[in-house]
Amino acid sequence: MKKYQRMHLIFIRQYIKQIMEYKVDFVVGVLGVFLTQGLNLLFLNVIFQHIPSLEGWSFQEIAFIYGFSLIPKGLDHLFFDNLWALGQRLVRKGEFDKYLTRPINPLFHILVETFQIDALGELLVGGILLATTVSSIAWTLPKFLIFLVCIPFATLIYTSLKIATASIAFWTKQSGAMIYIFYMFNDFAKYPISIYNSALRWLISFIVPFAFTAYYPASYFLQDKDVIFNIGGLMLISLAFFVISLKLWDRGLDAYESAGS
């Protein structure tokens, strides 16, 4: 484990050095993400200028859900975004072969090879929103510790779904479109799912479970809803999807044939 931790830090340092050679691109990337999320919030604020609440949720509560959703999304984007490369080109162009010739677990290698520093824009917006809305929560030490525990489990859902959909490329040669389609559902996690119809609520809760990355844990923090379902469900679903994604990865790896073969 320590060996992999050291290697991860080495990859991060090397990638940051590469990024710093193009400082303008870095700044533009971070600002682009920051402005995108800012415009979404501005639009939401305009809506609340005309209505007092949305399905019983105040603007401050929805802002908390929105901010909460950006933290796990941003962490996954920051550390594990290279899975997009697997789905889009590594298998199709035969570039995945190099990962099989190195004395490193290929999944670990792909996960830590890049460091998407523009994700700092998402984390910055998420942090600001949480900092400005936490006053709406009656914090206790157990609740604060639960909050800290929720973040890695919610991040794991993002990463697991990307591992699973990227692994489809082992059979189809590319799966970038599938990753994108699944990833689009994360936008629904930024808002209370009670505003959606029952079919969509079920879909984003148990099939593409992005609702557990923000809405359900936020429901516990904001409204003291059932901790077993909202927090326990997050942990159970994230671990279940992680195991499923690893199984799919292993089967795909066994089925892998180089694009040149």
What are these regions (language model features)?
Residues 1-261:
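Hydrophobic transmembrane alpha-helices and immediately adjacent juxtamembrane helices
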